Amino acid sequence: MSLDTTEKQELINAHQTHATDTGSAEVQVAMLTERISKLSSHLQQNIHDFSSRQGLLKMIGRRKRLLGYVRGKSEKRYSDLIAKLGIRG
């Protein structure tokens, strides 16, 4: 479940820290969150798609590591990010 170019650009614009920021941890977490959301809805319809389930778990782990990095750098950035994305963190 990939994101198309316009969705990616919207996420980048919403979460970038400066004008040319396309790969900061905040942007990566936002993209992973969107991909996780799409894949979760796919798995609700296709419950026996085990390879996609494994990919989902890998994405969740990657997002968790990135959130840990952001939290280590700045608690305020972390709390702002999880509030903006609506995730538990």
Swiss-Prot record:
| Taxonomic superkingdom | Bacteria
Q: What is the lineage of its organism?
A: Bacteria, Bacillati, Cyanobacteriota, Cyanophyceae, Synechococcales
Q: Which family does it belong to?
A: Belongs to the universal ribosomal protein uS15 family.
Gene name of the encoded protein = rpsO
**Which residue stretches does the UniProt record annotate as biased composition, category Polar residues?**
14-23
Q: Report keywords, A-Z.
A: Ribonucleoprotein, Ribosomal protein, RNA-binding, rRNA-binding
Which residue stretches, if any, does this entry annotate as coiled coil?
none
Q: What is this protein called?
A: Small ribosomal subunit protein uS15
Disulfide linkages recorded for this protein, renumbered to the chain, are none
